[in-house]
């Protein structure tokens, strides 16, 4: 890496961290953010079924809500992984590691059975990061001596107002760079030697975007970001490092 390339990485990071940090601060303090009307319209049907009034919670209720939500998501994800042909031990390890945001990659990405399994893990990459952010928000408010807030409100807004918009921008950029974005798990191609080869595919752009934003370690492919479908060019590396992997985790 040349000094100029390193400068570009740091420049993009420095330009992004201040506005993103201010946006996150508004979410923490329950202030109106950019696109407030749009986000509120998106969040309303999410809160309504669970009858969430976004009332302030006690420390006990906040922690219980955190545990219940994550337990429910673990059970759902473990069930999906198991029903799609993954071994019980692999389903347990993968679900636990993704929901705790540690993302041990004991699975072989190319042979991760089923599109539903991949979508379930993408969901956990959003919710595990959002759960951690919600707990951090509560700690910050507690240190400031103000009310802790509502866990359901914090986790939803972490996704709708930060993780999801940032992931969409990153995913579009990665698709432009050449990363595959498809629900097909594989394709068969004819090689120059006349034989046939099975090439694994998947929603790589979506996966990579939230993988880096949420500091998740599990890759869509076995070799993770060294695989050409996860990091196809210098520009995709800029997006992965400067925009997603440095900005939000640093804040």
Regions found by a protein language model. Give the residues of each.
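Hydrophobic alpha-helical transmembrane segments of multi-pass membrane proteins
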Residues: 7-11, 67-68, 123-130, 159, ...
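Generic structural hydrophobic/aromatic packing signal, biased to beta-strands
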Residues: 13, 80, 119-125, 139-140, ...
């Amino acid at each position: 890496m040349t000094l100029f390339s390193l400068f570009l990485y740091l420049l993009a990071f420095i330009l992004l961290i201040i506005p993103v940090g201010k946006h996150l601060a508004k979410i923490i303090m329950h202030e109106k953010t950019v696109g407030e009307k749009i986000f509120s319209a998106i969040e309303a049907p999410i809160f309504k079924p669970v009858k969430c009034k976004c009332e302030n919670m006690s420390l006990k209720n906040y922690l219980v809500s955190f545990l219940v939500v994550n337990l429910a998501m673990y059970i759902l994800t473990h069930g999906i992984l198991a029903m799609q042909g993954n071994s019980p031990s692999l389903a347990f390890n993968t679900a636990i590691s993704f929901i705790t945001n540690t993302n041990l990659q004991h699975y072989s990405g190319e042979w991760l059975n089923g599109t539903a399994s991949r979508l379930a893990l993408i969901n956990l990459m959003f919710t595990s990061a959002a759960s951690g952010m919600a707990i951090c928000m509560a700690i910050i408010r507690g240190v400031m001596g103000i009310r802790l807030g509502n866990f359901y409100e914090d986790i939803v807004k972490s996704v709708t107002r930060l993780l999801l918009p940032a992931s969409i921008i990153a995913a579009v950029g990665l698709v432009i760079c050449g990363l595959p974005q498809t629900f097909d798990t594989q394709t068969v191609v004819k090689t120059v030697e006349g034989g046939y080869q099975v090439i694994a595919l998947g929603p790589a752009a979506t996966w990579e975007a939230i993988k880096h934003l949420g500091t998740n370690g599990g890759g869509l492919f076995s070799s993770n970001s060294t695989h050409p479908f996860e990091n196809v060019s210098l520009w995709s590396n800029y997006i992965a490092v400067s925009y997603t992997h440095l900005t939000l985790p640093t804040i």
